[in-house]
From Swiss-Prot:
It is found in: Cell inner membrane. GO terms for biological process: cell division; cell wall organization; peptidoglycan biosynthetic process; regulation of cell shape. Peptidoglycan polymerase that is essential for cell wall elongation. Signal peptide: none annotated. Pathway: Cell wall biogenesis; peptidoglycan biosynthesis. Its main location: membrane. Keywords: Cell inner membrane, Cell membrane, Cell shape, Cell wall biogenesis/degradation, Glycosyltransferase, Membrane, Peptidoglycan synthesis, Transferase, Transmembrane, Transmembrane helix. This is Peptidoglycan glycosyltransferase MrdB. Pfam families: FTSW_RODA_SPOVE. It is a multi-pass membrane protein. It catalyses: [GlcNAc-(1->4)-Mur2Ac(oyl-L-Ala-gamma-D-Glu-L-Lys-D-Ala-D-Ala)](n)-di-trans,octa-cis-undecaprenyl diphosphate + beta-D-GlcNAc-(1->4)-Mur2Ac(oyl-L-Ala-gamma-D-Glu-L-Lys-D-Ala-D-Ala)-di-trans,octa-cis-undecaprenyl diphosphate = [GlcNAc-(1->4)-Mur2Ac(oyl-L-Ala-gamma-D-Glu-L-Lys-D-Ala-D-Ala)](n+1)-di-trans,octa-cis-undecaprenyl diphosphate + di-trans,octa-cis-undecaprenyl diphosphate + H(+).
């Protein structure tokens, strides 16, 4: 049976104009580094796109009552990690699915659960003109801070910070009263030196390495790889930093350095443009004229995640941020982060494609082309 044509009228193709080049180039780099890893990455791509189409047809707007259940299920999984989690590299972050060798990292689906719950709560209680006051702020903060605290205990400082930045970034952008955000800012500044003393030794070492005049070995090799790429990059055979394994974790945490060694400064500029374009396109859904707060918050949350992940990862490889193990979104080797983002984009496309059913913009406004369409209209007027 043919699908209603309005579904495809509202389907936003532009994110995939940004995403597909990322996946193609990423696969090329991973294949050049290891054919075995590229085969695994191909499997992750297949799973990610399969889940995209499965999730795309889930009626999220009708599942309000289930969003709390999803959230608490993810929180329970995070809590179980502390009791029966699997340890890797000194961190206890995974659960082993019974009777299989498959592991699940609950900190990935919890990002989806937090974002959906925030979108639901903001939808039923939109921000007033002057922004949220303490009551609503504290209520929303609880749902952000609880899973972040459980993730921090694993320990996984990087992911915990990502959750906090996404959650509180949404609240700051949609609006908080001055008497809320100003005391919080002061408290954050005062508490930062105190919080440092509660960090693990390896986390303190990463900060010390970042602040020292000489970068640590990993960052130094990354900077050398980036500098050696020149303006147009090198052939595969000439990429000595990657070829001779000087560059650590070249296909995951430091894949940006590998990419710049291969494609040079010009390639880096194009990669920046893709991430900035994708982030802005999603961010500008916030300025649609309708009152579809569920859609706006989901798009805003994905925009923040894309921007923060890419900014922190690139800054890390340049020695401008501590090494925290944050992947380059839709680019680094691995399945967890990629599948999470594909599910998030599936949810966004579902909210766009089926919104005519709920009376939210029966005609597409600028969902198909985002801020680019707005720019074209402005230039033409």
């Amino acid at each position: 049976m043919a699908l209603d044509k309005r579904i495809w009228m509202h389907f936003d193709l532009l994110p995939f104009v940004f995403i597909i080049p990322l996946l193609v180039v990423s696969f090329l780099l991973i294949f050049e580094s290891s054919a075995v890893l590229s085969l695994k990455q191909g499997v992750y791509y297949a799973i990610g796109f399969l889940l995209f189409w499965v999730v795309f047809f889930i009626p999220f707007r009708k599942l309000d009552r289930w969003l709390f259940a999803l959230y608490w299920a993810c929180v329970i999984l995070l809590a179980l990690v502390d009791f029966m989690g699997s340890s890797k590299l000194g961190a206890q972050r995974w659960l082993v699915i019974p009777f299989t060798s498959i592991t699940l990292q609950p900190s990935e689906p919890v990002k989806i659960a937090i974002l959906l719950l925030l979108a639901h709560l903001i939808k039923i209680n939109p921000p007033p003109f002057k922004g949220y006051d303490w009551g609503m702020f504290l209520k929303l903060s609880f749902y952000i801070c609880l899973p972040a605290a459980l993730i921090l205990k694993q320990p996984d400082l990087g992911t915990a910070l990502i959750v906090l930045i996404m959650g509180f970034g949404i609240l700051l952008i949609v609006g908080l009263r001055t008497r809320v955000w100003l005391p919080l800012l002061i408290a954050l500044i005062v508490a930062s030196p105190i919080a440092y003393h509660f960090l693990h030794d390896y986390q303190k070492k990463r900060i010390a390495d970042f602040l020292s005049e000489k970068p640590n070995y990993h960052v130094m090799q990354s900077i050398i790889a980036i500098g050696s790429g020149g303006f147009l990059g090198k052939s595969k055979e000439a990429c000595t930093q990657t070829k001779f394994k000087f560059l650590p974790i070249a296909t995951s945490d430091f894949i940006f350095a590998y990419f710049v060694e291969r494609f040079g400064f010009l390639g880096a500029i194009l990669l920046f443009a893709i991430y900035i374009g994708l982030s802005l396109h999603l961010f500008f859904y916030l300025f649609e004229s309708n009152s579809d707060w569920f859609l706006k918050i989901v798009a805003l949350g994905i925009s923040i995640l894309i921007f923060v992940y890419s900014s922190v990862n690139i800054a890390m490889t340049l020695g401008l941020a501590p090494v925290v193990g944050i992947p380059l979104p839709l680019f680094s080797y691995g399945g967890s982060s990629f599948i999470t983002f594909m599910i998030l984009f599936a949810i966004l496309e579902n909210l766009l494609a089926f919104r005519y059913i709920f009376g939210n913009n029966s005609k597409p406004s600028f969902g198909n082309f985002g801020f680019l369409a707005q720019l074209v209209r402005a230039l033409g007027s």
